[in-house]
């Protein structure tokens, strides 16, 4: 694999020499940073099992190497890397896998280690969604996830990835993560704080990542991280699990932040060692039981992961002074909810008791039941999935609901050919050789739902959302 030139400030190199253990050597670190990052993917087990995914992609000649800490994660090598971007493959478009850096799969693995099965989880810095979607898959779309993102421009990307992966148990918020400790104290069974950081571990992906690096900047970032972890710890219920992670390498933003929390609440913070998370953790394990992953250790991005438990209640923070505003939704009455469920089932959409229908004007939504305790405490950017819009003739089912709820085994499902599926993703109507019988057609490809179409004569009218329509080279170009 070709080398690339990484910019290293002298002060950074001095800091790394002091932070790095005696083995592996500092020269190994520098050499690893000059190598481009290996590509990696995570199979979305909400859509397909790992075994079925491997069978489906076997004809492509992809070399998939298992990632030790994530059984659904793989490093991927392709002979035709330049021929077709991974994001333009049919399997990616239908949400069967997520392009995710291997080391960024570590925090969620730690969150669910030792049989931990949380029902209400918060991801405090969630965009673009790799860890939120990984959490949802581990929860099998059950329970509730609050996914927060401070950057307004990234909330849209976060929602797009959640929708593509068929996730229904997520509520999105757009807040500074420092508000949650006061706003929702002791509300979450588990919290992931993948904290904003100096990004020292990502130089293999971005050789210029350290162009604006300085020790002073690290100190400012660490101060923010301490405020964030304090807020997260307040929002964690007694006995709950908090995972703190970064993609940086210095101790000030990593070990020191966790040690500060323990010094602040000495009787309430218990470090949970990660030595048994996967074979080979001893290469990255700190004396506190954290994982401090330098790039050369597992040939991935640099990363830090710590896991801790809240063992004692701590003093509450002052109640926030902001106003949430009126909640614009109302729960659907039981009788009408039954009618909606029956109508949805007729086009192949089904859901379990974890989701409950709510209404806003002519819009119908499905919210995870576990989020109801948070209504009135935070303002949501988006909640659950939009199921339908009502009109005089019935319901106009929404694309995100089809992706999350549809069963490809429904009697109105219609499997497209590769050429027809590509036309669908390009936003064009499809003219199948043998038209389906039903008027409302659940369009599938590779036995996966990709949309809902109206049959008009011999034509399937495309309903693929305009913002998702693709141009350029797609999967049949690589056939």
From Swiss-Prot:
So what EC number does this one have?
A: 2.1.1.178
Which BP terms does GO give this entry?
rRNA base methylation
Per UniProt, the keywords (alphabetical) are: Cytoplasm, Methyltransferase, RNA-binding, rRNA processing, S-adenosyl-L-methionine, Transferase
Under the heading InterPro entries, the entry gives: Methyltr_RsmF_N, MeTrfase_RsmB-F_NOP2_cat, MeTrfase_RsmB-F_NOP2_dom, Nol1_Nop2_Fmu_2, Nop2p, RCMT, rRNA_ssu_MeTfrase_F, RsmB/NOL1/NOP2-like_CS
Q: Name one GO cellular component term.
A: cytoplasm
User: Which coarse location class applies to the principal site listed for this UniProt protein?
Assistant: cytoplasm
Catalyses: cytidine(1407) in 16S rRNA + S-adenosyl-L-methionine = 5-methylcytidine(1407) in 16S rRNA + S-adenosyl-L-homocysteine + H(+)
A Pfam family name for this chain? Methyltranf_PUA
Any one GO MF term held by the record is: RNA binding
Alphabetized Gene3D superfamilies for the sequence: 3.10.450.720, Vaccinia Virus protein VP39 (3.40.50.150)
Tell me the compartments it is located in. Cytoplasm
Q: Where is the active site?
A: 247 (nucleophile)
> Residues that bind S-adenosyl-L-methionine, according to the entry?
125-131, 149, 176, 194
Q: What family does the Swiss-Prot or TrEMBL record give for this protein?
A: Belongs to the class I-like SAM-binding methyltransferase superfamily. RsmB/NOP family.
Question: What does this protein do, in the record's words?
Answer: Specifically methylates the cytosine at position 1407 (m5C1407) of 16S rRNA.
NCBIfam families for the chain: nop2p (TIGR00446), PRK11933.1 (NF008898)
- This chain belongs to the protein called Ribosomal RNA small subunit methyltransferase F
The scientific name of the source species is Shigella dysenteriae serotype 1 (strain Sd197)
Gene name of this polypeptide: rsmF
